[in-house]
Regions:
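Thiamine diphosphate
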Residues: 3-155
Length: 155
């Protein structure tokens, strides 16, 4: 993903210092609102587009933040790296000697459908050769856009 979205200047990459489950989507909406200079409230349009990049598990903690993005017309693209589960949690299995994690798989979630229900546009990418064109469409959209990128499940 860094080949498609390089970090080239200060104030262009934000993250949290620890576990980020549930943090990313509302944080991206807040950053878009701040970068837009509160454009939806002032009526002044902004060309600064925010890109939120996070996993499908994290997205499920705070998906309703997309409604705020759509309602305020924020210039943003959400990229969900979709491996079908809470992969970050599965890394704890060896540390805590857990043989099987329960409730960490998220098969069949329709993130594009959820985004549309929240008032956003979206697309799903299932093959790497299609990523560049889909990302271009997402970045050129006049509305908040969710890009659901399927990747291989971990483990």
């Amino acid at each position: 993903m860094q080949a498609y979205l390089p970090i080239e200047r200060p104030q262009s990459f934000f993250t949290c210092a620890s576990g980020g489950l549930g943090h990313s989507m509302p944080a991206a909406v807040g950053i878009a609102l701040a970068k837009a200079g509160r454009a939806p409230l002032s009526g002044v349009p902004s060309t600064q587009r925010v890109i939120g990049l996070f996993g499908d598990g994290s997205a499920m903690y705070s998906f309703q933040a997309l409604w705020t993005a759509a309602d305020l017309g924020l210039p943003m693209t959400i990229v969900i790296v979709n491996n079908g589960g809470y992969a970050a949690l599965s890394e704890f299995t060896a540390h805590f000697n857990i043989k099987q994690l329960i409730g960490t798989k998220l098969p069949g979630l329709d993130f594009v459908g959820l985004a549309r229900a929240m008032g956003c546009t979206g697309a799903r990418v299932e093959r790497a050769p299609n990523l560049a064109a889909a990302l271009r469409e997402a970045l050129e959209s006049s509305r908040p856009f969710l890009l659901d990128v399927a990747v291989a499940p971990l483990g």
